Structure formats: C-alpha cells, structure tokens
C-alpha cells in the first residue's frame, strides 16, 4: 500500500452565506493498493483544475470537502485505483478558522 499526499496552500472560494471570499488549505491523501499507483495516479494539475472549477460558484467548506472526496475516490475503471481518500480542508472565513476531514 502507498499513500500520496498533496497539499494546496491557498484555494479561494466564495462563501454561500455572506458572499465573502473564503480561503482554504486543502490536503488530499490517496491510498493506493500495491504498486498500481505508479502507472495510474491523480496528478496535481488535475486536482488544481477541479478546485478552480468548483470554487467559481459559492460553496461551503463541507460541500467542498465532500465533492473532492467523491470526485477522486476512483470508482471508474479508467481512474486511478484509489483504495482510500482523505480530504482535509482548513478554512479561513473572516476571523474564524475551521477544519473539516472526510475519509472514504
């Protein structure tokens, strides 16, 4: 088993409650079976493009975390063989900082 962790230091989003700008640090951990990840794995650019797309419209931190986990859990045979995915989001909403963690 192999775990690969990607950390995105700052992703901007729009708050669905007040329309303000939210800032997130996002950590995505993929656990792959055996050495399968060497031939087929999620690229940082793919993740970054997805984050940019889903944060164009207002989204809550919880919904952001869930969408990332579901999108990259590897259910399709053409996708990387992800055994487990953990998504951690650390949000800054004005003066408030929050952490959300989801594992599938």
Describe each model-derived feature in a short phrase:
Residues 1-104:
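N-terminal intrinsically disordered, cationic/polar leader segments
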């Amino acid at each position: 088993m192999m775990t690969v962790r990607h950390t995105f230091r700052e992703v901007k989003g729009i708050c669905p409650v007040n329309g303000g700008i939210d800032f997130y640090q996002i950590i995505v951990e993929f656990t792959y079976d055996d050495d399968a990840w060497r031939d087929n794995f999620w690229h940082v650019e793919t993740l970054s493009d997805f984050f940019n797309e889903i944060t164009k419209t207002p989204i809550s931190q919880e919904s952001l975390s869930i969408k990332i986990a579901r999108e990259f859990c590897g259910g399709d045979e053409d996708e990387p063989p992800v055994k487990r995915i953990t998504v951690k989001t650390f949000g800054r909403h004005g003066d408030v900082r929050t952490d959300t963690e989801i594992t599938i």
